Amino acid sequence: MSDGRDFVERDVHDFATAAETAIAGRLEAEGHEVIRGDGPLWTSEVATTEGRRLADARPDLTIFHYPVWAFPHFSMLAAEASRGPLLLLANVDPQFPGMVGMLAAGGALDQIGRAHARAWGDIRESAVL
């Protein structure tokens, strides 16, 4: 997930992509098959399209990663397309407020009754991933 404003997305895109790559790498190193999105969800259209595309792959678990602030409705749109278990994962970084975005998304998903779990911390720590 990423910020929906184009001028902010440009500034955080590389950070968000690097964080996603690190998470995917850690999961793959542990033997998990990772089905990645085509990029950060930063518009309503992308959230809906990617949510449907990933749901069609029928993953055992869908992880919404929040490396930076993200508008909660992106999570609601993507979650609407997914049917399996959902994990909201946020980094804790003073420069990039990913946890704030994850908490906002979690509240939005609670409001629509979409079950999910939440995890947060330094993604480089084994206790987090």
Predicted regions and their residues:
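An N-terminal assembly and electron-transfer interface module characteristic of large anaerobic redox
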Residues: M1-L129
